[in-house]
């Protein structure tokens, strides 16, 4: 709440290792486990009561629904670059999921930049594949240019200086 009330802070970028929505290389783990909610995260050596998808949704509730300032989720576990648009229209559950489903109040971008890792991971089919607007196994650097309320993201190959992707939000 302090963050939301602080008028000096306009934009927040949340960086974490594990993608909320993996696209290649980690569909059997990360925050998806091929849609299996049975795996439990561990805190202080003990499994928590809720499954991995439920815990993912709790994070989304905080970062997307309870905050207007979080602009992007920056991840890196997968050895690729992927830009994924997450909204309430994005399919984020397996077909047979019977537990409560989060309703996102706004959209957000997940930017995965694990492209410096090896080996590179190819894109795999997921429920949200249609929401991936760029996927690359090139080495890239992701740059954010912030000017007041405007944010411009540039994704550049650091060897060739080729512009791989860009986004304004």
For the regions a protein language model found, what residue spans apply to each?
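Metal-dependent phosphoesterase/phosphodiesterase active-site architecture
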Residues: 1-14, 19-27, 40-73, 78-169
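Aromatic- and acidic-residue-enriched segments that line the glycan-binding/catalytic groove
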Residues: 28-36
């Amino acid at each position: 709440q302090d963050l939301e009330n602080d008028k000096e802070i306009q934009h927040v970028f949340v960086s974490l290792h594990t993608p909320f929505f993996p696209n290649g290389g980690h569909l059997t783990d990360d925050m998806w486990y091929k849609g299996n909610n049975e795996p439990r995260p561990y805190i202080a050596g003990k499994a928590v009561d809720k499954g991995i998808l439920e815990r993912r949704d709790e994070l989304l509730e905080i970062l997307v629904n309870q905050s207007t300032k979080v602009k992007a989720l920056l991840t890196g576990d997968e050895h690729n670059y992927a830009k994924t648009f997450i909204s309430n229209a994005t399919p984020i559950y397996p077909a047979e999921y019977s537990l409560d489903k989060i309703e996102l109040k706004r959209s957000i971008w997940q930017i995965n930049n694990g492209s410096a890792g090896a080996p590179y991971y190819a894109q795999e089919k997921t429920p949200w594949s249609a929401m991936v607007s760029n996927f690359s196994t090139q080495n890239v650097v992701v740059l954010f240019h912030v000017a007041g309320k405007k944010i411009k993201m540039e994704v550049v190959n650091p060897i060739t200086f080729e512009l791989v992707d860009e986004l304004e939000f």
